Amino acid sequence: MDKFADLNYTLSVITLMNDTLHSIIQDPGMAYFPYIASVLTVLFTLHKASIPTMKIALKTSKCSYKVIKCCIVTIINTLLKLAGYKEQVTTKDEIEQQMDRIVKEMRRQLEMIDKLTTREIEQVELLKRIHDNLIIKPVDVIDMSKEFNQKNIKTLDEWESGKNPYEPLEVTASM
């Protein structure tokens, strides 16, 4: 376990890999050498990082299958990103989580639509009642008996003495 965390050991392994590649490939001007070295470096780093992580995870976890599956999916996704692909590998658990999230969002939107349509129906009913109250109903004969200013009006025949009490009798002028 000490060798896994030892930086000198890691650097010496990388140097050994580079020396081996240089000895195998005699032509130093080869165009693919940097790419091969990069891929081997990434693979070596993944190897060094994943083995201790897997050992610790398997010892501490109760469900080793899920841990292994998660580690493999992560490694494959890393390799796909390094290769330039934008697609990712997903597990069934992730797909189910995304589907649950989508279904919850759809339910929330349906509830919102239901609330909005209920409010709109209530508003339309209220507007109809207001419209019905505001409609002018035509009346053929106007009944003026209920008007307050028409109650005490008397005709000439109804007056006691037969003459208009509001007409002045004499005209007097002040001097």
Curated annotation (Swiss-Prot):
It is a single-pass type III membrane protein. It comes from Rotavirus A (isolate RVA/Human/United States/WI61/1983/G9P1A[8]) (RV-A). It is found in: Host rough endoplasmic reticulum membrane; Host membrane, Host caveola; Secreted. Its main location: host cell. GO terms for biological process: monoatomic ion transmembrane transport; symbiont-mediated activation of host autophagy; viral process. The chain crosses the membrane at residues 29-51. Residues 1-28 are lumenal. Keywords: Activation of host autophagy by virus, Calcium, Enterotoxin, Glycoprotein, Host endoplasmic reticulum, Host membrane, Host-virus interaction, Ion channel, Ion transport, Membrane, Metal-binding, Secreted, Signal-anchor, Toxin, Transmembrane, Transmembrane helix, Transport, Viral ion channel, Virulence. The keyword ATP-binding does not apply. One of its GO terms (cellular component) is membrane. The N-glycosyl content is primarily Man(9)GlcNAc, with a small amount of Man(8)GlcNAc. Glycans are attached at residues 8, 18. Residues 52-175 are cytoplasmic. This is Non-structural glycoprotein 4.
